[in-house]
């Protein structure tokens, strides 16, 4: 997949199509909450496997049962179709 920067209209569609994600400072971000650390870490492990598949890696934080994921494409300096795809895949994992 060749990444390209999403335009304003595409970004507006992204936050509607992919629930829970917000646009903040040239990145998309979502907070995920779990019952405990084990569930949070299991989620992160599943996400890591998808990230490797796309060779695209998030900035993320984990504090006990909370995971915050931030996506952007550093090489292009903004939010791309690759970030959109990864956000959608991450939501699928969370919804399982």
From Swiss-Prot:
Organism superkingdom: Bacteria
UniProt-listed Gene3D superfamilies: Transcriptional coactivator/pterin dehydratase
Keywords: Lyase
InterPro entries documented for this protein: PCD_sf (IPR036428), Pterin_deHydtase (IPR001533)
GO molecular function: 4-alpha-hydroxytetrahydrobiopterin dehydratase activity
One Gene Ontology biological process: tetrahydrobiopterin biosynthetic process
Pfam families: Pterin_4a (PF01329)
Family under the similarity heading: Belongs to the pterin-4-alpha-carbinolamine dehydratase family.
HAMAP family: Pterin_4_alpha
Protein name: Putative pterin-4-alpha-carbinolamine dehydratase
Organism name: Prochlorococcus marinus (strain MIT 9301)
């Amino acid at each position: 997949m060749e990444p390209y920067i999403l335009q304003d209209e595409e970004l507006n569609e992204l936050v509607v199509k992919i629930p829970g994600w917000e646009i903040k400072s040239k990145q998309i971000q979502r907070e995920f909450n779990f019952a405990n650390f084990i569930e949070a870490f299991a989620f992160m492990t599943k996400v890591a496997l998808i990230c490797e598949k796309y060779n695209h890696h998030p900035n993320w934080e984990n504090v006990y049962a909370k995971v915050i994921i931030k996506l952007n494409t550093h090489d292009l300096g903004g939010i791309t179709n690759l970030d959109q795809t990864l956000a959608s895949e991450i939501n699928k994992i969370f919804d399982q």
